[in-house]
Amino acid sequence: MTSFDALLVAGFGGPESMAEVPDFLQRVSGGHIPPDRLAEVEHHYARFGGVSPVNAQHRALAAALGEALVARGIDVPIANANRHSMPYMDQALADLQSRGIRRVLTLVPTPYASYSGCRAYREELLAGTRIDDEGRPALQVVKLDPYADLPALVTAQVQLLRAALADHPDAHLVFTTHSIPTAMAETSGPHGNAYIPQHLALIDAVMAELAALGLRPSWELAYQSRSGSPRTPWLEPDINDVITRLAGEGVRDVICSPIGFLTDHMEVVWDLDTEAAATAAEHSMAFTRVATVGTLPVFIEGLADLIVAALSTKPGTGPDAPAARHWCTPDCCPNARIAGRPTIPGFAAGPR
């Protein structure tokens, strides 16, 4: 018996043909990204036939989680939804409602706290939930809290890096994550400034496990994929600037680990595999991009355990309920454009 009737895997979304690219970019930009930047990104998609890898990888993630849950004796419907491409949030929620679903647990494949990576999904999930005849949401929808502290995420990263370091033992390790506006980073999490520390805590745990294996590469954190107005401060340094600096310091081999992404996005296959790799080549540096954790079995098993704990916990109860954990509060990760926009609640699945 579970406290939820379905699991929704809600992602950013991406186009799956060139015909979908213009509408997708307009939805993403919302009029806040300069036209020249949009044209540049459209060119990136054209290089890949207009197809982002992210939707297929999120479908694979959902399928792998479904198998892992069934192996644990839990068989609930699992659906996919996206913020910026089909199936949209409201479509997926309406479909679940039509199937008699009433309580939905949502997993967003972004483990860190920020407006763009957490609250924006909570806002859109509420906006996409139909209202019944009595003026109440027809579905009870909650979103699993950020899970950057999931031990399986550390183990998966160590597994990937151990293999890369075996081939490149003298490489300098650069962890990357999505740059966000500095103001967004400063207001991330219930008490602010959670975004960067969550990454650093994950890196510290990864490096400790690598050290236990006798691997002690030098490392740093860099950012990638900034967009928006150039007048708005975003997190730095950029991965390409880091590579250029490292070349000047005599570094000849770089391993890039995109810990900010659980699956491949266009930001991974273009910004890293294409642009960052080209920057390294310009400086005659070896460049290795570590895979995203995706459906790596050790990660799926750990994530499935977290979801089982959530599916088995009644919302609002238990020693680690949202109110007790003080995470994903109504005011955290605020919307800088629409103050106070309502959201669905976050949901804590128990101590990890």
From Swiss-Prot:
- InterPro entries recorded for this chain? Ferrochelatase, Ferrochelatase_AS, Ferrochelatase_C, Ferrochelatase_N
User: What PROSITE patterns does the record tag this protein with?
Assistant: FERROCHELATASE
> NCBIfam families from the entry?
hemH
What does this chain do? Involved in coproporphyrin-dependent heme b biosynthesis. Catalyzes the insertion of ferrous iron into coproporphyrin III to form Fe-coproporphyrin III.
Cite a single Pfam family from the UniProt record.
Answer: Ferrochelatase
**Organism ancestry:** Bacteria, Bacillati, Actinomycetota, Actinomycetes, Propionibacteriales
Query: SUPFAM superfamilies, alphabetically?
Result: Chelatase
This protein's name: Coproporphyrin III ferrochelatase
In what pathway does it function? Answer: Porphyrin-containing compound metabolism; protoheme biosynthesis
User: What gene does this protein come from?
Assistant: cpfC
Species, as recorded: Propionibacterium freudenreichii subsp. freudenreichii
